Regions:
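Non-transmembrane, aqueous-exposed alpha-helical and coiled segments at domain scale
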Residues: 1-181
């Protein structure tokens, strides 16, 4: 049996969210750098250089890579032999970790979650609640993965329900010109 303190879960979630706000994964940096080295177009090379410079400055200054620090999604694998020391539910621990991360005085992250998105649309100002996916697994460990998904890419989006026989490529070719720059 493994005993996990509420505070350890909370702080782990908060630390992980701060970390991903200012560090790109190493494989991303490596891939952009390799593409930069191969690139022949000056404009494309300049764009990749800006990404690499921004990434370095964010890591050094511990500042967000992007102003849209996203909707938090947390993936939990909870071992069946895990016990909790404290009186908080797992969802409460995760959301307290999100709250601490987004309100951290040295690196306040942009809160963009609404408490009632279909009604009053009031910003929670701490980016809670998180989207939490929980899986109970054999064992005595807790595995926590966090992601922060920005919404900017959805600002210009379309949704379609296609029949199985419809062509996705045809729909994209027809729709893309109607979306503007």
């Amino acid at each position: 049996m493994t005993l996990i303190r509420n505070e350890d879960v909370i702080q782990s979630v908060a630390d992980a969210l701060q970390y991903i706000s200012y560090y790109h994964p190493l494989d991303f940096i490596t891939a952009v750098n390799e593409a930069y080295e191969r690139e022949e177009s000056p404009a494309a090379k300049d764009a990749m250089a800006q990404i690499l410079i921004n990434s370095r400055l964010c890591a050094e200054g511990k500042r967000p890579i992007c102003q849209d620090t996203g909707i938090v999604t947390v993936f939990l694998k909870v071992g069946m032999d895990v016990q909790w020391q404290g009186d908080m539910a797992l969802e409460e621990m995760v959301n307290e970790g999100v709250r601490r991360a987004y309100l951290h005085p040295a690196n306040v992250l942009r809160a963009s979650i609404l408490s009632d998105p279909a009604g009053a649309r009031i910003n929670t100002k701490d980016n809670t609640p998180a989207v939490i996916h929980t899986q109970v697994v054999p064992g005595n460990k807790l595995d926590v993965k966090v992601a922060a998904k920005g919404g900017g890419s959805e600002n210009k989006s379309k949704l379609v329900m296609l029949n199985p026989s419809d062509s996705i490529a045809d729909w994209v070719e027809k729709t893309l010109p109607t979306m503007g720059a």
